Amino acid sequence: MPRFSVIESLCRQDGICASVCPAHVIKGPKGKTPFMRPDRQDSCIACGQCMAFCPFGAARVDVLDPSDMLPLERSKLPDAESLSMLFQSRRSIRHFKKEPVARELLQHILDETRHAPSAKNRRAVRWIMVYEPEKMRAVGDCAVEGLKLGLQNPETGPVLAEAKALIKAWGRGLDPLFRGAPHLALAVAPIGQPLAREDAVIALTYLELAALPYKVGACWAGYITGIARQYEPMQRLLCLGPDAEVRGGQLLGPIGLRPTASAPRVPFATQR
């Protein structure tokens, strides 16, 4: 289990680490050196909250590397106007350039999602990156076979016409599944993990935003996600294993067409 400690020469005994610990693992009133509560030895979730909030770098959690910490430069944070522009400019990209994204860049973008929050800091989401054209084609072919099988299900009625159109378009050499995106990122999490789907959606949203500065566009891969949850051949192709499930996905690739304005939005209804 993770263990909390302090570097006493740096500690100012201000009680901040104890006050911000969400698991109430730390005891340390002002004027005294904080320590890990004996009755909470197995409760640390290694969230790093104590390390992030300590102004003097005194807090430590043994499973977390302090060299991985980034000093926060407030001047580099977006102001309200810039942040609003980012939110309003975000659009799903469905027109991609044909060239691939460098593997190193995709890995860097994926690495940014480490900072996405997760329930109780479980960090159960992992990634499957489909990179090569041959593998993308195999995933697409498998998805179409899954759609064909789904047409035999009497409960498929509401999506029958859509599935038929997808199958027909794929057979004609069109790409309704990937929309020309050269890559696919799938967020995978354990079956039965509480709030794992929500964790995956948050991580996928971080992924989309992290890609934008590099002119890498993203589009939610709803068809592939739905098929991967139900179609065993797809699960085998992705090497999922019996205890894991695809919780969401993003198509990724160099942006072909980008928006020039925000789209109008009807305000949310708010209950007061």
Region spans (language model):
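Acidic, surface-exposed loops and disordered segments
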Residues: 1-272
